[in-house]
Amino acid sequence: MSVYLLHLASTHAHFHLPELETLAKIENVEFWLIPKSEYLNVAFKSDKSRNQALFSHAIKEFQDSISPNDATTQNPFMLAVVNSNEDARRWIRRSIFCKGIYEIYCIGDSFTRLHEKMKELNPAPWDSFKHNSSYKFTFETFGTRRTMKEQLSIISDFEYMQLQGPVSMHNPQHVFTVLENRRNNVEGPKVYFGHWCGSGSRDAIDTFDLKQRSYIGITSFDAELSLVTAQMAMAAPGKLIYDPFVGTGSFLYTCSFFGAHTLGSDIDGRQMRGKNGRSIKSNFRQYKLSPFFLDTFTGDVTNCPLRKNLLLDAIVCDPPYGVRAGAKKIAKCSQRPPKESSSTGNHYPKLEQYQISDMVYDIICFASDRLVDGGRLVLWLPTITEEYGIDDIPSHPYLSLIYNSIQPFTHWSRRLLTFQRLPRAHDSKSLNLLPKINNKTPSHHNFREKYFSSAGRASASTKFSPVLE
């Protein structure tokens, strides 16, 4: 077991821990977070029971460091205990928020103290490869930047390491990294030194950048959060993932990027089909992910044509809020169908308005029927900040809410809810009709009207459309 430092992005901090825990489950990696109070004490790294006891403290500490206004963190460095370098690499290799992971050699509140502690290491962790292996030094700073002159001066102070191998800036065998948090208001250690183990997949954000996508619409979802949605769905090879509000397919691309097979549906087939040769299919060709795309169909989540015994590994969706796109469903027909259907020509079902609170209820009921045991429903839900309460979160006896991550705006928020299907062996045979979200009206009821109310207009300056974010 060793202590590792995670260098995280400073934005969307509410999503960091859920992603890390989900990736650990996907890769079957065991880890423990370390609270700041223990950062200068790495002697406990092999004490498994103590690590577990400190885990909850570290989580609370990280959550308290998140700004409530913009969901940023003042300290993007997090320490964790992991079993091996290989586990550390596998753990964060597909992470969207983790820039890199480093095996930590020393931590100090200043460079002077760092060097003192480094010289006390016996044996030094780099002794086994200091003679013949190529290497280089890199810097990661938060809060400011180091000039090249400053970097060279700091590197020269590590001469006591007596590294005798050649320097290789392009293909080194070992990378030593100095990480520094130079924010004045940050308490605790300011300087970290370690050995680079691996990087995340933040370059995927550029891959799926909406500005580079051939076909988008007004509901196309931000690339970074689309990738996180796929992470929370545990998208991976061999998985089948469905989006019942597919729109222009943002979630399908990112789920397929991680190897899952995807399909989607929407009440309005025009967005899926596109025009002038640009469509969901053309985007799959652009990303070279066509083998993972099954198909799309025009349909309604309340009248889904998928066969009942088709179980899904995950359902991902961003239901229409009624702001950029209206929510509709197929209306019940009060008339009998004509006897001779051939004489009627094409038939288009009548649609009616769909209240978002009713839609959410239908989604979780659908998910409880169609998910495999342990499958996930990953759902984006808008909430009004001043009215938000625990009753806003939908519940179902067969689904367990495991994550509730928030993206705050001015007067409203967008929450990423992650539910997990409980084992069917424990299903109640007497369950008939579920109460609609605890029999209380959630704050997202009539969300459109609230959004465009006086409070809503004040927040309209906040970029709403994921296309513009």
UniProtKB/Swiss-Prot annotation:
Gene3D superfamilies: Vaccinia Virus protein VP39
GO molecular function terms listed in the Swiss-Prot or TrEMBL record: methyltransferase activity; tRNA (guanine(10)-N2)-methyltransferase activity; tRNA binding
Listed Pfam families: UPF0020
Catalyzed reactions: guanosine(10) in tRNA + S-adenosyl-L-methionine = N(2)-methylguanosine(10) in tRNA + S-adenosyl-L-homocysteine + H(+)
InterPro entries xrefs: DNA_methylase_N6_adenine_CS, RlmKL-like_Mtase, SAM-dependent_MTases_sf, tRNA_mtfrase_TRM11
Classification via SUPFAM superfamilies: S-adenosyl-L-methionine-dependent methyltransferases
Organism superkingdom: Eukaryota
Entry keyword set: Cytoplasm, Methyltransferase, Nucleus, RNA-binding, S-adenosyl-L-methionine, Transferase, tRNA processing, tRNA-binding
GO cellular component, one term: tRNA (m2G10) methyltransferase complex
BP terms from Gene Ontology: tRNA N2-guanine methylation
Keyword S-adenosyl-L-methionine: yes
Main location: cytoplasm
Subcellular location, record wording: Cytoplasm; Nucleus
Known role: Catalytic subunit of an S-adenosyl-L-methionine-dependent tRNA methyltransferase complex that mediates the methylation of the guanosine nucleotide at position 10 (m2G10) in tRNAs.
Complexes and interactors: Interacts with trm112.
Family according to the record: Belongs to the class I-like SAM-binding methyltransferase superfamily. TRM11 methyltransferase family.
UniProt name for this protein: tRNA (guanine(10)-N(2))-methyltransferase
